[in-house]
Amino acid sequence: MTERTLILIKPDGVTNGHVGEIIARIERKGLKLAALDLRVADRETAEKHYEEHADKPFFGELVEFITSAPLIAGIVEGERAIDAWRQLAGGTDPVSKATPGTIRGDFALTVGENVVHGSDSPESAEREISIWFPNL
């Protein structure tokens, strides 16, 4: 089934020079880039994106990090795009859950700065795409 998902290459992925390799991995997997935008996220967008974590102690730190430097927001589409992207990304904890060969397993060291984000369901993808790309 063809799906669309939001991807973010977070500020650590951009500032550490991993954008080209991450995009290459997406394309090698057979996924298509439907939209790609380099931007500095504003606080309102970041807070909407992470609203499910608003009552958690790390919320402020998460918003500060995601708005701290440029990031890449993108839409990836293809057959089972959500699962395919999550497989490429690896587990959210890059040391204990992300295996080598995944983006997080290869490029990240902490849960807070784990290089990429991807929607975890079709519903999340629809919501997140509308936040980051309201005109699409």
Curated annotation (Swiss-Prot):
InterPro entries: NDK-like_dom, NDK-like_dom_sf, Nucleoside_diP_kinase, Nucleoside_diP_kinase_AS. It holds the Pfam family NDK. Its main location: cytoplasm. The keyword Kinase applies. ATP binds at residues 10, 58, 86, 92, 104, 114. SMART domains: NDK. It comes from the Bacteria. It is found in: Cytoplasm. It catalyses: a 2'-deoxyribonucleoside 5'-diphosphate + ATP = a 2'-deoxyribonucleoside 5'-triphosphate + ADP; a ribonucleoside 5'-diphosphate + ATP = a ribonucleoside 5'-triphosphate + ADP. One of its GO terms (cellular component) is cytoplasm. Its EC number is 2.7.4.6. GO terms for molecular function: ATP binding; metal ion binding; nucleoside diphosphate kinase activity. Homotetramer. This is Nucleoside diphosphate kinase. It comes from Corynebacterium efficiens (strain DSM 44549 / YS-314 / AJ 12310 / JCM 11189 / NBRC 100395). The lineage of its organism: Bacteria, Bacillati, Actinomycetota, Actinomycetes, Mycobacteriales.
